[in-house]
């Protein structure tokens, strides 16, 4: 069976193999077909990472995180780091984070206060038994954390912060309340509610919000309401900080692409009967989504969204999410470029792209 076409992965992976024990095990964990071999690699990987963090000497881990040869190896490595950073013994701390993606629209620059609506949030969470443990014997930071601050925390910092309650309290002191800057126009952001508890919160982590999704959205809508700004909030599942960061970053970029795409389609339809969409990979770890008229006679200024691939992004999922959006918007003229574009080169218009090697994914799954 032929595999469906996936755009080229142009992330800057190492060109020669790296002799790093962590990467060797992470690669085996990601790619070995033997369950026994994967289990052994997983155990060795976690043991090695645990030893490095406990000795506060993890240069090899930092190297491995920047030199993974593919997305699967990187994901295996990060999953192992995440496992080691969970509360493993009684008395250790389990950190958790709840991402909130915010779509903002305003006619001038604004500052959004990020205080945590603790009472309303706890009342909402307590209504759902599968989320209730987040409110029992837990401690929450009284304000939301911005993505740049949370992503700047090292595995070594998280390791120290999970040792006991005293270390967790010291860790919380590193954060400070900062308003979120909303630029003029439309923008998409992600912030995080951060807290800690014991091992009993672990079953909640990664659970789908289910029926709690809409009530939680209403809590954030009311708490973050700002005069002169239109806000839409999208709460995501509670998770460990590392996984919450990955979920939040991916969803923020996906929602930014959705907002850009619908705006571009609307503006082109005002001037042309048919919208043409071109999708192509570009060297440097980017996927470009371009919108224009199908007919060169109606072409307008190209509107292009650039997706910067994170280390954990799966291109096939990014592609499929975009294709689903195009179907929802009733766009039929879509063209996937088979070959990656050189770095800094421009994405061709729809009319130009049809002369290049590619296909329409709605009518052909294969090149």
What is each PLM-predicted segment?
Residues 1-74:
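Charged, amphipathic alpha-helical stretches
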Residues 348-357:
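Short cysteine-rich clusters marking metal-coordination/redox-active sites
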Residues 1, 45, 52-53, 65-67, ...:
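Detector for methionine-enriched segments
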Residues 346, 360-367:
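C-terminal recognition-helix end and immediately following basic linker
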Residues 105-349:
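Extended, non-transmembrane interaction/recognition domains
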Residues 45, 49, 54-151:
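Long amphipathic alpha-helical coiled-coil/heptad-repeat bundle
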């Amino acid at each position: 069976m032929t595999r469906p076409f996936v755009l080229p992965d142009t992330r800057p992976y190492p060109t020669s193999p790296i002799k790093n024990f962590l990467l060797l095990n992470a690669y085996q964990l990601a790619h070995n077909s033997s369950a026994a071999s994967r289990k052994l690699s997983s155990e060795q990987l976690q043991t090695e990472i645990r030893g490095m963090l406990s000795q506060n000497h993890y240069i090899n881990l930092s190297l491995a995180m920047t030199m993974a040869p593919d997305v699967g190896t990187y994901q295996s490595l990060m999953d192992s780091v995440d496992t080691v950073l969970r509360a493993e013994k009684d008395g250790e701390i389990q950190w958790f984070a709840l991402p909130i993606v915010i779509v903002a629209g305003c006619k001038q620059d604004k500052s959004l206060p990020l205080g945590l609506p603790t009472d309303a949030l706890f009342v909402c969470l307590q209504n759902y038994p599968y989320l209730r443990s987040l409110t029992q014997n837990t401690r929450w930071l009284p304000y939301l954390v911005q993505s740049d601050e949370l992503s700047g925390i090292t595995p070594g910092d998280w390791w120290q912060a999970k040792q006991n309650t005293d270390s967790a309290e010291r860790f919380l002191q590193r954060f400070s309340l900062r308003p979120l800057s909303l630029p003029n126009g439309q923008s998409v952001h992600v912030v995080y509610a951060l807290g800690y508890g014991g091992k009993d919160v672990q079953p909640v982590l990664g659970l789908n919000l289910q029926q709690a999704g809409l009530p939680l959205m209403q809590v954030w809508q009311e708490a973050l309401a700002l005069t002169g700004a239109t806000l839409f909030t999208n709460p995501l599942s509670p998770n460990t900080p590392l996984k919450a960061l990955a979920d939040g970053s991916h969803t923020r970029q996906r929602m930014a692409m959705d907002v850009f795409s619908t705006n571009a389609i609307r503006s082109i339809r005002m001037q042309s009967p048919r919208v043409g969409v071109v999708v192509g990979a570009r060297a440097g770890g980017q996927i470009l989504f371009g919108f224009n008229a199908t007919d060169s006679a109606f072409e307008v200024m190209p509107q292009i969204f650039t997706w910067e691939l994170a280390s954990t992004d799966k291109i096939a999922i990014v592609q499929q999410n975009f294709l689903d959006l195009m179907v929802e918007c009733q766009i039929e003229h879509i063209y996937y470029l088979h070959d990656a574009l050189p770095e800094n080169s421009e994405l061709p218009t729809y009319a130009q792209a049809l002369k290049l090697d590619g296909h329409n994914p709605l009518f052909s799954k294969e090149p």
